[in-house]
Amino acid sequence: VETAGVDELDLKARIGEVLSRWPVAGLAVGVVRHGSLAWFHGHGVADIAAGTPIDQDTVFRIASVTKTITAIAVMQLQEQGLVDLDTPASAYLNAYRLIPARPGFRPATLRHLLTHTAGVRAVREPSDLLRPALGWGTRAGRPVPSLAGYYRGGLHIDAEPGTKWAYSNHGFATLGQIVEDVSGVPFGRYLRERVFGPLGMDHSDLVRSGRVRTRLATGYVLRSRGLKAVTDREVVPAGGGSVYSTTGDMARYAAALLGGGANEHGRVLGPATLAAMFEPSYQPDPRIPGMGLGFFRGQAGAHPTVSHDGIWPGFHSALVLAPDQGTGVVAFANTGPFSPLAAAGPVASAVLRSILGLPGDAVRTGVPEQPRAWGELCGWYTLGPGVLTDPQPRMLGGVQVSVRHDHLTIRGQIPVPAVRRGLRLYPDGDDPYAFRINLPGFGSGTSSVVFSRDPNGHVTAMHLGVQPLSFQKRPGAQNPGPWAAGALAASAVALAAGHRHRARRAVAIKGGRT
């Protein structure tokens, strides 16, 4: 590992600050620069009982970072002329059907699936909300059903494609199935032969094979009495989150993403194709970075970033790249609830900012406020009525913008005290309709919040930057509607486990190694 130009003291201090809020059994962090792993930091253990230390070859479940790899596979088919991103996905999907809620819906395309705008529901059926891991997993050791069996009744399209952003594991599972149906090669084998193999990722796989099994970390959640191992499950919608990998292998992957599709071992995509994946393919508003093809777009200081996080019970992962600087960070933790509230994402962001010479992510406090616009901004904003396409954001019930203590604030109907009390909207420049909120307690640093207007100048919507969600303003509404209470009650149950980790019982874990 080449550590030249890396300020280890600053990196470890920033990591330590995150871990003081999000304790873990084990954490692995890799910094990629100049096409290789420039710095590695291992903290804690892969398995508490065995005392196995974290190292570069510890295997983690990378969860939804898998989606970026699935997107690479789709774009390989596009380069070969085997698929067209704007052709209906059903033209390539043989294993099961996509079923629109209304016959007049436009067809869902591969581009829609790659940007979470296909209208695919987050759960196969409402009863999945009551199942472990939302019905996405099956106990380890049991047969994993084929997607044809898993979606035997078809996969439902609940919103018209192209009209709404809603994060969907099932959409990326469908992309993986399309890769299999078009190539004629099982998806796991396809990734081994055409992505992992060319990039030298010898300790990565879609399934729990001999390539990954012996070095696999144990996943934990933090309970009031300490760390507890999670129930081990396999991911059924594999293209959405099933890959196992190591810090070393994911550093090789990041090097290829920063190297125009190639690293020192080989090439998986052409530079122009990869560049197109990083460009905006969905933006609810031009001020929101939005989505590329399989990647979230963002900003670190003046530097554009592309990234993806992953969440699975007991595991959290993050990949964040600053392509203009040829720099990337991968981070993996084997501790965390099935919610975004955990260490890997904040660690990756903090490390990248350190490498780029940036201070910690914070709102700008010296920007003058513009109260003249507050009156038209205040009110209730909702995701709107209709089918529950994505239960996680819909748990907000409604979002209220109001003036509290002489500041503009945003308040959500969700059982998180800070959000229910209200988060201050800090002005983010001269634009009176652009703000930032401070989210350090949620592992997200800051997030942009912008308001859009119709041609007549009336405020019609609010858009979030942390995920490209849009909330529509409800003129004259005094509350989010009677369904908000139900959403709030449902979210209280669903989020309860995700907040148990906030207990700050000390956990004895050995220190880090470089």
Label the model's feature ranges.
Residues 106-109, 171, 242, 246-249:
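An acidic site on a long C-lobe helix of protein kinase domains
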Residues 2-41, 134, 180-185, 189-193, ...:
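Catalytic loop of the DD-peptidase/beta-lactamase superfamily, centered on the K-T-G motif
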Residues 70-71, 171-176, 251:
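Well-ordered alpha-helical segments within folded domains of soluble proteins
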Residues 494-506:
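Short hydrophobic alpha-helical membrane-entry/anchor segments
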Residues 38-40, 96-105, 118-126, 188, ...:
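Secretory-pathway/luminal and periplasmic proteins that interact with or process carbohydrate-rich
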Residues 93, 114-118, 199, 257, ...:
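Hydrophobic aliphatic residues
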Residues 2, 506-514:
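Intrinsically disordered, highly charged
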Residues 9, 21, 33-36, 45-169, ...:
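Active-site-proximal loop and beta-strand segments within enzyme catalytic domains
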